[in-house]
A protein has these predicted regions:
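Helix-rich C-terminal or lid/interface subdomains of diverse kinases
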Residues: 40, 133, 250-317
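Active-site Asp-x-Gly
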Residues: 210-214, 219-278
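ATP-binding pocket architecture of kinase catalytic cores
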Residues: 34-156, 163
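Short, surface-exposed acidic
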Residues: 30-35, 186-190, 272-280
Length: 317
């Protein structure tokens, strides 16, 4: 995976809404009754489409090049290996003279994002643990899809996990040093990255023997729930790979994830390596810096706990 700043392609929200309506009508062959903006990150923008017959889909625009094949491939692959709903890709469309960005249509998962549900957040410990049980059972199903090589789902060629991951992590550190030298990255972040890198061979001393399919961005914000606070689906994979399955676990501690005992539940049910805690600390820190390098956005309420956790885990070595 390339570690570099990506400039988002301009896409006016008003124009995008009209594009979504036109494309949905063309691709599905039904008149559109309503279009609603659902949200988006640095490089995506999603719209809910309601047709006259009340069927609903989502059209997602990709504001960076070379994302379309990867995203649609990974959604289909994950959906085929997960008992919980992951949106089925309905169509894809490359950028052209009419629409300046790539896009695709997919199924709508009804419900709401788990991170915004106060009802779920404040529910009893029993219900939160039940939610964790449902999530981790589904994740283990994804992880049960294995490959004979490690690496990107589109091209996995590595015999060992670290043959893929160590050069990738080193790229992140090199780019982070460049950003720090320009005064763009806080000193506390680069210092803890350096300290963690010095201990890399210890942190990753346990051999990863299985190349497991991972979601890549498995945090509470990418879990959907229904009106009864039951798990209804997963969305937005990022850089899905055949990888160390524990790479999917660091996101469980981000945002409000700890409230649901997600990582604890997974480890209790399926086990983990002896160094899982410090590996997840490393994965989490370097992933967040990677996201910053790509987008230029440093999210303090995510980054600061990752820095603190990495310091704690290094002190425990």
């Amino acid at each position: 995976m390339k570690v570099e700043r990506i400039k988002a392609i301009a896409l006016d929200k008003k124009n995008a809404q009209q594009y979504a309506k036109t494309i949905a009508c063309q691709q599905i062959g039904q008149p559109v009754k309503k279009v609603k903006y659902l949200g988006g990150g640095s490089f995506g923008r999603a719209y809910k489409i309601v047709f006259q017959n009340d069927e609903k889909i989502v059209v997602k625009f990709l504001r960076a090049n070379d994302m379309l094949e990867k995203e649609t491939h990974d959604l289909d692959l994950l959906a085929a290996n997960c008992p919980v709903k992951i949106p089925k890709v309905l169509f894809s469309r490359k950028a052209d003279n009419e629409v300046s960005v790539d896009c695709y249509g997919m199924e709508l998962i009804e419900g709401s994002n788990a991170i915004f549900s106060l009802g779920l957040l404040l529910s009893s410990k029993r219900k939160r643990k039940q939610f964790a049980d449902e999530v981790t059972t589904a994740l283990q199903s994804i992880h049960s899809c294995k490959n004979d090589k490690f690496g990107d789902t589109l091209c996995s060629t590595y015999n060992r996990w670290l043959d893929f991951y160590k050069p990738y992590a080193e790229q992140i550190l090199v780019k982070a040093e460049e950003r720090f030298s320009k005064g763009e990255l806080p000193k506390k972040v680069i210092e803890i990255m350096r300290a963690a890198w010095e201990k890399f061979d210890i942190i990753f001393s346990e051999e990863v023997t299985e190349a497991c399919l991972i979601h890549g961005d498995f945090n509470i914000a990418n879990m959907m729930i229904d009106k009864k606070h039951k798990l209804s689906g997963f969305i937005d994979p990022l850089n899905s790979m055949y990888a160390d399955r524990e790479y999917d676990l660091f996101q469980f501690d981000n945002l409000t994830g700890k409230r649901f005992f997600l990582r604890q539940t997974y480890v209790e049910k399926y086990g983990a390596s002896k160094l899982c805690d410090i590996k997840c600390a490393f994965y989490g820190l370097y992933h967040e810096v990677y996201s910053y390098i790509k987008s230029g956005m440093l999210v303090g309420f995510i980054m600061n706990p990752l820095v603190k956790n990495m310091k704690k885990r290094l002190a425990e070595l």
